[in-house]
Regions:
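Short, cysteine/histidine-rich loop/knuckle motifs that typically chelate Zn2+
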Residues: 5-6, 26-29, 289
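ATP-dependent adenylation/nucleotidyltransferase module used to activate substrates
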Residues: 34-265, 269
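Short recognition patches in nucleic-acid-associated and regulatory proteins
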Residues: 2-17
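Residues immediately within or flanking Cys/His clusters that coordinate Zn2+
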Residues: 1, 21, 284-287
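ATP/NTP-dependent adenylation/nucleotidyl-transfer catalytic domains that generate, transfer
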Residues: 38-42, 214, 247-248, 260-333
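Short linker/helix segments within small regulatory modules
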Residues: 13-22, 279-282
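Basic DNA-binding region of bZIP-type proteins
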Residues: 21-24, 28-39
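Cys/His-rich microdomains that often coordinate metals
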Residues: 8-11, 28-31, 106, 294
Length: 333
């Protein structure tokens, strides 16, 4: 017998939803129809012209601020294109809204330079948050890798491998093996490699949450696009842009339905200043050494080889400390 994840009713093999055994047939079919409708809705939102998207984005931001108050909302600011567009729009409504920037110790120099410009020249209300844990211990990228493993391939793959490696019971371990076999067969050979998804938690998410709690913040405004990853699109299909009082963190994601083209159009149209990194043919400003998605890049011209050209000092540090790991992961550096 099984227990449906939605209705909590027991069901046997004959009443199991064929596409996903977590649901009974009735709930599984209804969920599939709902997600299909949500995908159509997302496609419709994405097809709107830029000015309509700006109006909708401002509505969502206002909804968050009206719900929690301006003094209890903050922008999680990375210094990248998406969060800079979000900041530009939000400051039109609330010029002094708080921004929290997590210095992960793995930032591009151009990102840090842009943060200082935002603070000193653009008068953006930014607090820089460092990766200090609840015990007062300072972390950095190398320390996280040594303790937990390297962020490689994708968050889902890294999480699956970490779960397998740290399973506390034979049952959990077998479930992890089955999950990887079912979803990530091509990564099975890396199951014993030092891989983990904990990096973002230790260097960014947890320090930001602690600082937000310390400051009495109740809602985070995030400049993320649903198109950026499977997980983000799945989250939008399930919950939409503004997710209040459902989870531990209240979230406003008013750019979810934007595309990369929308972001670029907005930057050009409104002359928004972004880090010089984007003038060096980079399309993202995330952590320098992050391995998420590197396997999808051209083997002979991936982000690490680009780092060698644009930031030789940082590349030398990367090779000295993590070059051996890249060989284990079959990544050309």
């Amino acid at each position: 017998m099984f227990i449906c994840k939605i209705c909590d009713e027991e069901y046997d093999e004959n009443m199991r939803y064929s596409r996903d055994s977590r649901y009974c047939k009735k709930c599984g079919e209804e969920r599939t129809q709902y997600l299909s409708y949500r995908r159509d809705t997302l496609a419709s939102l994405r097809s709107m012209p830029l000015e309509a998207k700006i109006i909708q984005t401002k509505f969502l931001i206002n909804q968050a601020v009206r719900t929690f108050g301006e003094d209890h909302c903050y922008i999680s600011y990375s210094g990248g294109k998406d969060s800079t567009v979000l900041s530009h729009i939000t400051k039109q409504l609330y010029p002094n809204i708080l921004h929290l920037f997590a210095n992960t110790t793995n930032e591009y120099p151009e990102t840090l330079k842009h943060i200082q410009w935002e603070i000193k020249e653009n008068h953006t209300n930014i607090i820089i948050v460092y990766p200090i844990d609840s015990k007062g211990e300072m972390w950095n990228f190398k320390k996280v890798v040594e303790h937990y493993g390297y962020p490689m391939f994708s968050k889902r793959v890294s999480n699956a491998i970490r779960t397998y490696q740290h399973a506390k019971t034979p049952h959990t371990k077998q479930n992890s093996i089955d999950y990887i076999e079912r979803n990530f067969k091509k990564y099975q050979k890396y199951m014993e490699s030092p891989i983990s998804d904990k990096c973002c938690d230790k260097l960014k998410k947890e320090p930001l949450r602690r600082k937000a709690k310390e400051l009495g913040m109740e809602c985070v405004i995030l400049g993320i696009l649903a198109s950026e990853s499977y997980q983000r699109e799945k989250a939008w299909l399930e919950y939409g842009c503004n997710v209040f009082y459902k989870f531990k963190d209240n979230q406003c994601k008013p750019l979810s339905f934007w595309t990369d083209d929308d972001i670029n159009e907005y930057i050009e149209k409104y002359n928004v200043k972004i880090p010089d990194l984007y003038n060096m043919d980079y399309t993202r400003n995330g952590c320098m050494f992050c391995g998420f998605g590197v396997h999808l890049e051209a083997p002979e011209s991936n982000r690490y080889q680009k780092l060698k050209e644009t930031h030789p000092k940082q590349y030398a540090y990367f090779i000295d400390n993590f070059g051996g790991m890249m060989l284990q992961f079959d990544i050309i550096v």
